[in-house]
């Protein structure tokens, strides 16, 4: 929602170019992660959707940089968005590199109701704080 709110302030002439693309790429990150999460019984499909999310996150960073250069975003706002997307990219890279830690295998007895949040909180990714791992 943050990008939606920020792009509401962009000039009207950007509505059908930068604004649409910026919003689409940011929404697509979440949509691809959700789709991949539901496909984690199939490692190749899981990695494919996470890879799509990674590409969309990188595209969102590109739109952030372009909006900054056009003076549609302040440097502080652009830096905050970039930091958020770097964290997302870090987690995606971790999940893509080690899909076996995330996919459902029948021999592990994983439950279909196992939540993404519980899996991420147990992540070995260095960007996840120790306090989050304990939750």
Where are these regions (language model features)?
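Short, C-terminally biased terminal segments at protein or domain edges
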Residues: 1-135
